[in-house]
């Protein structure tokens, strides 16, 4: 299947996409992860992206598109789930045309629905290991007891005072994608509240419905 998963920060997109890859073989394509990996490996695209980031500039949309295109091609244009892309109607239109040119249209777009108060709690309870980058959650995935607590920190964008701004940006820039895909009969709303396995069960039900 060819899928997109999107929703506000804290909706659990990455967690659920990872489970789909682990249990159903649907490869998670996270443009953020791809970008970081490309820079770490110093690929041509990665070096270009790093030059913008080092200069304090946003990575151009065309460069992100190139990364997404290569990742999709690497998967043979099938059995993938995009996480973090597209973010705008313009990106969605490009993706539609790109997939159509390969006769591999999307099968569905999972839209994660979570109330703001739940999002704020999820995000404000996330922690990261300062040295390894390993992420944890104080409620359902706390750091092991043998980890130095002084190295467990909160990301600046997960601090309560910045979370609302992130949600506002999401609504302004990304939420309109729901309309774009709803008009194309691809949107599948998913209740993202509850435990990880509970939400995953709803996603599996949604995928079963798409396959029928």
UniProtKB/Swiss-Prot annotation:
Which CDD domains would you find in this protein's record? ADK
EC number(s) stated in the UniProt entry for this protein: 2.7.4.3
Annotated positions binding ATP: 10-15, 126, 135-136, 194
Q: Name one GO biological process term.
A: AMP salvage
Quote the entry's note on domains. Consists of three domains, a large central CORE domain and two small peripheral domains, NMPbind and LID, which undergo movements during catalysis. The LID domain closes over the site of phosphoryl transfer upon ATP binding. Assembling and dissambling the active center during each catalytic cycle provides an effective means to prevent ATP hydrolysis.
Q: Self-association or partners: how does it assemble?
A: Monomer.
Tell me which NCBIfam families the record gives.
adk, PRK00279.1-3, PRK14527.1
Q: What is this protein called?
A: Adenylate kinase
Q: Which organism is it from?
A: Salinibacter ruber (strain DSM 13855 / M31)
Q: Which gene encodes it?
A: adk
């Amino acid at each position: 299947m060819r899928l997109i998963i999107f929703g506000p920060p804290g909706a659990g997109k990455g967690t659920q996409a990872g489970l789909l890859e682990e249990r159903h073989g649907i490869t998670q394509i996270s443009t953020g992860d791809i970008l970081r990996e490309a820079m770490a490996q110093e690929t041509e695209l990665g070096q270009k992206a790093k030059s913008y980031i080092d200069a304090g500039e946003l990575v151009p949309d065309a460069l992100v598109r190139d990364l997404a295109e290569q990742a999709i091609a690497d998967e043979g244009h099938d059995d993938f789930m995009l996480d973090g892309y597209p973010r705008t109607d313009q990106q969605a239109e490009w993706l539609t045309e790109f997939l159509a040119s390969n006769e591999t249209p999307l099968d569905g777009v999972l839209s994660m629905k979570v109330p703001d108060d739940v999002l704020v709690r999820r995000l404000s309870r996330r922690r990261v290991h300062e040295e390894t980058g390993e992420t944890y959650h104080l409620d359902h995935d706390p750091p092991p007891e043998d980890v130095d607590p002084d190295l467990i920190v909160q990301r600046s964008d997960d601090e309560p005072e910045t979370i609302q701004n992130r949600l506002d940006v999401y609504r302004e820039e990304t939420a309109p994608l729901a309309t774009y895909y709803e008009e194309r009969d691809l949107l599948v709303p998913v209740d993202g509240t509850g435990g990880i396995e509970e939400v995953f069960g709803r996603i599996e039900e949604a995928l079963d419905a798409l396959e029928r």
